[in-house]
């Protein structure tokens, strides 16, 4: 028996020997066609070559292309497992000519491979041609096909087009006859839908260009595009009628049978087939960067996974099954597709996580389904409201409910399901607080309801293609925007990160046909799932539906990544240094800096800051890899991950691990956090970390502002320049600046002390406005007033204390006049404070000076006023207040 791997290799070798470039399979996510969810045909990676938009260094090519058909109009999901030839994932063998050879050589090459290399009997083959394609008919006759097995087909089945405009042309399909024991007739007959005649190869002759609906012209250089399903030709060459009986599928089905200890035929036949097919689709999609999600490609993958997981449940699997089948998949297909080998741990982990989480709700959902269908008869229809509850509460995609009821011959009310979905969206719209601008909020709800969320591709690439879904201008949707317009654009997919989790949104540019360029200034996420690109149309014009090329400002993103990863390292370092009470309270991650708010009751010491900086920079130097895993929030937190303050998490979270807690083999990660932001791939990419400020935000919350990379280097360079300038001014070397400053500070302190003593001596020696002639007697209390010039408020306290000491028992008041203002201090000896308050005396003086207030203790108080000319009045006011004190 010829293995599927041998068949693939022989096909590629056949065309390579004929001068064709051997082109590896492109990833399943198309990079040049934003209208496609997945690559679904072998020609997709060559689309721009056929249209002339891309030039390659070869004119003929051959490939085995990975394909997925599980969404949109190309959707085989519902039939998978129940027919002989439907698959979600399949391989398309093909040969292509870009203006090189045409019909005659294409037919000759196909014929020599099928009947020569592979030895398929010519009498088992039938071909079709487009009914007006006499050239193809004659070429098949020339090669030896009898007229009776060359069938003219007048329908679009035998005419291919890329779209409403562009390259197009007639097709010629090759069919294999499995024999009279299989029901069905030849193509074009009333019973052509039977399984006897199976199409194994389609040859497309691109010889025209569709200019518009009415005009079709000849292409100057006709091209060839062919496609052959590997699974179908493997069935033919292995002598079986059913694709699921070929070697690759048999191995996968045998593995699921062994692990579940169930028969692979009979009642469980469909379940084993679904699992085998969906395992292939899931494995290759994850290997090509698609992960389960609630939007876009990720949601299609989730539907595929959950459909397989329900069938695993039907087989009685008590534990997650799918991830245990991955080694069998890698064994069968890893040699041809090394990406499967490289991604095997990620594939296994993703499948296990998804199945573990889904199993938690699957049993409850199936119980609800059993209760709802218990009294139903074949042909009955499940109410749409029940199907929606299964979707909304238990995570059952609509098609999974359909599949679950298929064996019972029960239907589902799709219109009722859609009505329940619409009702929930209306309730969400009514509850939305939004920005407070009702019209603007309505626009984003409309866009989200019409298109769903934007698929974010920016974890793996900083540029990509997207289809323009909506244009918002001045808060309203418009169909077109021109140069100079300030707009917000929504595409079906984008590499631009939308502001969230403290990380600022991406900037960059968007380009398109006819010189279109849009400068993107920011990206936001209205409603949390739609990426809104805000910018200005620089040149050209743009309309909804246009294909666009989106390019993130790579330098800006690089700096943001470094800053974001640095916040994680800083968080861990703070907890290590200060204690586990430290938690993140907020952050701002920009391109030029970042700030990090955290819980801590007091300011950090210089030693704290130095130690934290050193620890973060040590991990940067160690340059450990940053890894990402998908987990449930509970599992992530149980594994030690820190959650971001104020963030809401869905059923699945990205867990970022970076650094090592120690250098021993097997050491735990230094930092583990839940985070949806973009990060460096290795810590060395941060380059340098520098704290530039630490301050209080509120009670119990501190803030650190910091720089990384080039910004940190420039900051340090500027500080170095300032140090050199200071050294020059001090006439010393930079290294000696601290010592020189210490000397100068001490000299200043000495001079200040000497000046204060001189002023005090002058004051005690008598002032210009009043002179102490000894204490007065006021109501039996000794009262010593003084008015002095040029003494600052700080010097008053010492004078008052000296006066109190000289009095033994009494009251001292000193008024100092400076630059037109006056300061006053009053002192009361300890034996009098129960009767006389220095505070009351000062308040009386301050009022006389034109001021307000004044305060202190009963034995010492100070205040001041703006009118220094009233110094004598202030003394008099104190004298009057003292005279009124009861004896």
From Swiss-Prot:
Function: Catalyzes the attachment of alanine to tRNA(Ala) in a two-step reaction: alanine is first activated by ATP to form Ala-AMP and then transferred to the acceptor end of tRNA(Ala). Also edits incorrectly charged Ser-tRNA(Ala) and Gly-tRNA(Ala) via its editing domain.
Enzyme class: ligase
Cofactors (names): Zn(2+)
InterPro entries in the record: aa-tRNA-synth_II/BPL/LPL, Ala-tRNA-lgiase_IIc, Ala-tRNA-ligase_IIc_anticod-bd, Ala-tRNA-synth_IIc_core, Ala-tRNA-synth_IIc_N, Ala-tRNA_ligase, Ala_tRNA_ligase_euk/bac, DHHA1_dom
Any one annotated GO CC term: cytosol
Gly residues bias: start-end ranges: 851-866
Protein name: Alanine--tRNA ligase
Family stated for the protein in its record: Belongs to the class-II aminoacyl-tRNA synthetase family.
Compartment annotation: Cytoplasm
Principal subcellular localization: cytoplasm
Co-factor binding comment: Binds 1 zinc ion per subunit.
Record: residues binding Zn(2+): 564, 568, 675, 679
One term of GO molecular function: zinc ion binding
Domain of life, per lineage: Bacteria
Gene behind the chain: alaS
Listed EC numbers: 6.1.1.7
Organism: Rhizorhabdus wittichii (strain DSM 6014 / CCUG 31198 / JCM 15750 / NBRC 105917 / EY 4224 / RW1) (Sphingomonas wittichii)
């Amino acid at each position: 028996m010829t293995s599927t791997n041998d068949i693939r290799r022989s096909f590629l070798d056949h065309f390579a020997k004929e001068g064709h470039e051997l082109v590896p399979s492109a990833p399943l996510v198309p990079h040049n066609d934003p209208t496609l969810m997945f690559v679904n045909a072998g020609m997709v990676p060559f689309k721009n070559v056929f249209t002339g938009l891309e030039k390659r260094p070869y004119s003929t090519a051959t490939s085995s292309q990975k394909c997925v058909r599980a969404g949109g109009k190309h959707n085989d999901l519902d039939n998978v497992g129940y027919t002989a030839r439907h698959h979600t994932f399949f391989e398309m063998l093909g040969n292509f000519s870009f203006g090189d050879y045409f019909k005659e050589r294409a037919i000759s090459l196909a014929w020599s491979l099928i009947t020569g290399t592979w030895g398929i009997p010519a009498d088992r083959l039938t071909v079709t041609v487009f009914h007006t394609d006499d050239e193809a008919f004659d070429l098949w006759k020339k090669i030896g096909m009898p007229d009776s097995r060359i069938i003219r087909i007048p329908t679009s089945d035998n005419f291919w087009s890329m779209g409403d405009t562009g390259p197009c042309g007639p097709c010629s399909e090759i069919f294999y006859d499995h024999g009279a024991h299989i029901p069905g007739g030849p193509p074009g007959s009333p019973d052509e839908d039977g399984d006897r005649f199976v199409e194994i190869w389609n040859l497309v002759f691109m010889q025209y260009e569709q200019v518009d609906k009415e005009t079709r012209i000849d292409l100057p250089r006709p091209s060839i595009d062919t496609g052959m399903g590997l699974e179908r030709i493997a069935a033919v060459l292995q002598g079986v009628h059913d694709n699921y009986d070929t070697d690759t599928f048999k191995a996968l089905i045998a593995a699921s049978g062994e692990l579940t200890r169930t028969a692979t035929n009979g009642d469980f036949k469909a379940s084993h087939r679904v699992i085998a097919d969906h395992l292939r689709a899931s494995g290759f999609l994850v290997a090509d960067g698609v992960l389960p999600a609630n939007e876009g490609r990720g949601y299609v993958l989730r539907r595929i996974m959950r459909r397989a997981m329900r069938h695993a449940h039907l087989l009685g699997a008590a534990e997650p099954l799918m991830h245990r089948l991955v080694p069998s998949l890698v064994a069968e297909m890893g040699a041809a597709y090394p990406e499967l080998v490289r991604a095997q741990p990620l594939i296994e982990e993703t499948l296990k996580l998804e199945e573990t989480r889904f199993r938690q709700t699957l049993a409850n959902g199936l119980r609800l389904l059993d209760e709802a269908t218990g009294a139903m008869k074949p042909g009955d229809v499940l109410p749409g409201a029940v199907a929606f509850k299964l979707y909304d509460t238990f995570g059952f995609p609509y098609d999974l409910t359909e599949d679950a009821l298929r064996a019972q011959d029960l239907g589902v009310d799709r219109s009722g399901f859609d009505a329940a979905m619409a009702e929930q969206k209306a309730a969400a719209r009514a509850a939305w607080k939004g920005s407070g601008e009702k019209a603007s909020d309505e626009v984003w709800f409309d866009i989200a309801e019409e298109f769903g969320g934007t698929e974010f591709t920016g974890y793996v690439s900083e540029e990509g293609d997207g289809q323009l879904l909506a244009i918002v201008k001045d808060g309203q949707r418009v169909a077109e925007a021109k140069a100079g317009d300030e707009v917000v654009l929504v595409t079906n997919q984008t590499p631009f990160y939308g502001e969230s989790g403290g990380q600022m949104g991406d900037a960059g540019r968007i380009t398109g046909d006819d010189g279109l360029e849009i400068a993107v200034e920011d990206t936001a996420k209205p409603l949390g799932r739609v990426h809104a690109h805000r910018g200005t149309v620089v040149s050209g014009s743009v309309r909804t539906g246009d294909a666009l090329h989106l390019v993130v400002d790579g330098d800006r993103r690089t700096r943001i990544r470094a800053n974001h990863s640095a916040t994680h390292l800083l968080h861990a370092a703070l907890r290590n240094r200060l204690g586990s009470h430290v938690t993140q309270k907020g952050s701002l991650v920009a391109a030029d800096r970042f700030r990090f708010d955290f819980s801590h009751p007091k300011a950090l010491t210089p030693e704290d800051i130095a130690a934290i900086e050193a620890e973060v920079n040590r991990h940067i130097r160690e340059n450990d890899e940053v890894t990402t895993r998908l987990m449930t929030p509970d599992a992530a937190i149980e594994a030690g991950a820190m959650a971001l303050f104020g963030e809401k998490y869905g059923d699945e979270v990205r867990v970022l691990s970076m650094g090592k807690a120690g250098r021993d083999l097997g050491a735990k990660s230094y930092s583990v956090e839940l985070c949806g932001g973009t990060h460096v791939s290795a810590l060395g990419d941060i380059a340098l970390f520098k704290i530039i400020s630490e301050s209080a935000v509120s009670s119990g919350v501190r803030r650190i502002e910091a720089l990384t990379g080039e910004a940190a280097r420039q900051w340090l360079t500027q500080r170095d320049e300032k140090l050199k300038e200071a050294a020059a001014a001090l006439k010393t070397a930079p290294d000696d600046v601290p010592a020189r400053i210490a000397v100068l500070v001490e000299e200043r302190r000495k001079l200040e002390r000497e000046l204060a003593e001189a002023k005090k001596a002058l004051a005690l020696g008598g002032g210009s406005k009043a002179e102490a002639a000894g204490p007065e007697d006021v109501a039996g209390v000794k009262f010593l007033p003084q008015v002095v010039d040029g003494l600052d408020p700080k010097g008053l306290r010492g004078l008052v204390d000296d006066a109190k000491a000289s009095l033994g028992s009494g009251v001292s008041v000193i008024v100092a006049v400076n630059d037109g203002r006056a300061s006053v201090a009053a002192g009361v000896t300890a034996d009098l404070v129960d009767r006389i308050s220095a505070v009351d005396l000062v308040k009386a003086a301050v009022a006389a000076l034109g001021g307000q207030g004044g305060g202190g203790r009963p034995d010492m108080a100070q205040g001041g006023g703006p009118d220094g000319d009233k110094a004598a009045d202030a003394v008099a006011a104190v004298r009057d207040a003292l005279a009124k004190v009861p004896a």
